[in-house]
Every structure is written in structure tokens, then in C-alpha cells.
């Protein structure tokens, strides 16, 4: 069920139930912050919260609509932190859209990036597809007890999805997995894996893309063909060693990908 409140204090007490949050709850908070467009996570024992700034993100109404659609489809308990006026404005603007509509919006990136450790990349190639953490765990293909998203406060059902990002985010995740804790320093050395570039337009058209108000993701599995455009590894981008930093690996891979993308788009 989806609830709306005008304001919310980020602490462990759920304003709807009066009790502590359990993992079934998720929050969408509309702000006027100048410090970010979108951000997500859990602070001060509060439920997982997606924050979207009206001042910095012009597509905030679409984000609200996607969040509502995602929560309704997955029967999640959700809290919208915004005025009734802003909620009505978002609903009116979103009319005719769906959180999983099979098209890529003008505001969405044409390429989605997923980063993975090298040993996982070998398994992905063997399987011919990406799989969610929960699917891999069910198949006993991984030994880790919990996904890294748990450290970030992710809801448990997020492990049903393959997450995508851009910039250096994926490399931060790979490095953090290796270190067993969240490492935000993009200049620390780590063992590079594979940085995978996917055709987002084709993924959307074929019904794979899911939007939750903050992320673009895919549920359960994604075949490599015909969606994978290119896989960057330390060898394919010309590094002298598998050891690098998240910043260098991401920058070098993205730079080389631009020429590959031009060839791909001209086909």
C-alpha cells in the first residue's frame, strides 16, 4: 500500500505504523536540495529512501510515477514524502506511462553499464547471460551469504534485479566486493573485472527495462545477445596489468567505447 505524508524524519520509527520499519517498506522523498539530482540509501535506521530534488532533476514527475507503478506492481509498502499538490501534478504528468513501458525515453541513456569481477565475467560468458544475485544464489553459483546491496540498505527484493549504472559506480561496487566493505575511494588499487556496455534502447523495446524512480534495472536475467555491445577488460583497453584503479579503468574503458559505439550506431 502507498501512503503520503508531508514530511518525514529519517529515523527507525515508521510514521504509518508507529513501529520500527521492517524490510517491506520503501520511501520516496521529494526535496529541493541543490546537492544532488537523485540519491538513495538508508540513514539513521530509516527504511531505504530514494531522494529526488525538484531543483536539480527536471524529470522528477516521471520518477514519482515510476516509483508508484513499481511499488504497486510489486505490492510494496511505500511512503511518498511530498505535498498533495506535487503528487497530483506528478500523476497528471505521468498519465499514459508505465514503469516498465517498452521504449527508451528521451531522458534515459542509450547505453547502460554493468561491471562485474573477472571470475564472474567468465561465468557470465559461459551462461550467455547476466543473472540476478537471487537467481545465482538459487543455482548455488555463488558462495557469498548476502549481496553487497545489503551494506547499502537495499531492500531484499532488489536482489531479484540486475543493476546498471554509469561513470565509476560499477567499479566502486567491484572493488567493495573484493575488500568486503564499501570503498568509495576511486583512486585505490583493485583487480579490474569486466565493464559491460548494453544497448538500452533494444533492452527497453524488448521489455527488459524496469524503472523504480531512481534506477534502471532488469529482473532475473538478461541474455548477452543481442544486447551486449562491448566488454571492456584490462586487456581489451590496453592496460599493462589487471591491477588498476576504478577511476582509470572506467575512464579508459569509456574513452575506447566511444569509437566502438560510433561503429555500432552506423550498422
Outline where the language-model segments fall.
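Conserved NAD+-utilizing ADP-ribose enzyme module
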Residues: 1-107, 156-160, 169-267
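Short, extreme N-terminal leader segments that mark the start of a protein/domain
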Residues: 91-135
Amino acid at each position: 500500500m502507498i501512503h503520503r505524508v508531508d514530511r518525514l524524519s529519517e529515523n527507525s520509527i515508521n510514521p504509518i505504523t508507529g513501529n520500527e520499519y521492517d524490510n517491506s517498506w520503501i520511501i520516496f522523498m521529494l526535496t529541493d536540495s541543490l546537492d544532488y539530482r537523485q540519491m538513495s540509501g538508508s540513514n539513521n535506521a530509516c527504511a531505504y529512501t530514494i531522494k529526488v530534488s525538484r531543483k536539480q532533476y527536471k524529470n522528477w514527475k516521471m520518477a514519482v510515477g515510476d516509483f508508484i507503478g513499481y511499488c504497486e506492481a510489486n505490492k510494496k509498502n511505500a511512503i511518498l514524502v511530498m505535498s498533495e499538490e506535487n503528487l497530483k501534478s506528478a500523476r497528471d504528468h505521468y498519465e499514459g506511462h508505465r514503469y516498465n513501458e517498452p521504449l527508451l525515453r528521451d531522458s534515459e541513456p542509450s547505453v547502460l553499464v554493468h561491471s562485474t569481477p573477472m571470475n564472474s565475467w567468465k561465468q557470465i560468458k559461459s551462461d550467455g547471460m547476466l543473472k540476478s544475485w537471487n537467481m545465482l544464489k538459487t543455482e548455488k553459483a555463488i558462495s557469498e551469504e548476502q549481496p553487497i546491496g545489503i551494506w547499502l540498505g537495499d531492500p531484499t527484493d532488489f536482489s531479484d534485479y540486475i543493476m546498471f549504472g554509469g561513470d565509476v559506480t560499477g567499479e566502486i561496487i567491484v572493488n567493495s566486493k573484493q575488500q568486503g566493505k564499501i570503498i568509495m575511494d576511486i583512486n585505490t588499487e583493485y583487480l579490474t573485472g569486466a565493464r559491460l556496455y548494453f544497448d538500452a534502447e533494444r533492452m527497453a523495446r524488448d521489455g527488459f527495462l524496469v524503472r523504480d524512480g531512481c534506477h534502471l534495472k532488469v529482473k532475473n536475467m538478461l541474455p548477452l545477445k543481442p544486447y551486449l555491445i562491448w566488454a571492456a577488460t584490462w586487456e581489451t583497453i590496453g592496460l599493462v596489468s589487471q591491477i588498476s584503479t576504478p577511476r582509470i579503468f572506467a575512464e579508459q574503458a569509456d574513452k575506447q567505447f566511444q569509437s566502438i559505439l560510433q561503429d555500432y550506431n552506423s550498422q
